[in-house]
């Protein structure tokens, strides 16, 4: 979990890190509170009874104060260069006239001890451009967008 948090901190004041302690029996609550004390205004600890992954995500959405929301599980981390590139693009888009509902990026499965990375690419979607669902084309059976690849707008 700490690797995840440390990978998100370079976002600075532009990023609000919500750590949802979903009734964990490990040190999650303690670690969340520690980071909230160390990084006030950036990290917030949310404590709740266990409701499963979906309820933890919903708690994050309910408590988010920023314009965008992204799920990063505690055993995941973000690549620094990709993260900076995405934050730069989101800043540009937030300052413009275009209202962005979702930002979809490739997602890399990189398991420790496994030699090959698996990259989730969305070849049926237009690349490097803003598009509507009408332009997205059709998804085939078995195709989906992985939740971890999406950054969602929090406001209508």
Task: Describe the residue ranges of each PLM region.
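Nucleotide-sugar donor-binding/catalytic module of glycosyltransferases
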Residues: 1-156
């Amino acid at each position: 979990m700490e690797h995840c948090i440390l990978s998100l901190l370079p976002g600075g004041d532009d990023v609000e890190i919500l750590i949802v302690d979903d009734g964990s029996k490990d040190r999650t609550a303690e670690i969340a509170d520690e980071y909230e004390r160390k990084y006030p205004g950036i990290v917030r600890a949310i404590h709740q009874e266990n409701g499963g992954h979906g309820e933890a995500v919903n708690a994050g959405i309910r408590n988010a104060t920023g314009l965008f929301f992204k799920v990063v599980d505690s055993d995941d981390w973000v690549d620094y260069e990709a993260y900076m590139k995405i934050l730069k693009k989101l800043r540009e888009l937030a300052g413009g006239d275009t209202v962005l509902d979702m930002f979809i990026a490739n997602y890399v499965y990189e398991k420790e001890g496994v030699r090959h990375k698996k990259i989730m690419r969305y070849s049926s979607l237009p690349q490097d451009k803003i598009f509507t669902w009408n332009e997205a084309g059709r998804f085939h059976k078995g195709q989906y967008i992985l939740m971890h690849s999406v950054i969602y707008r929090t406001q209508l």
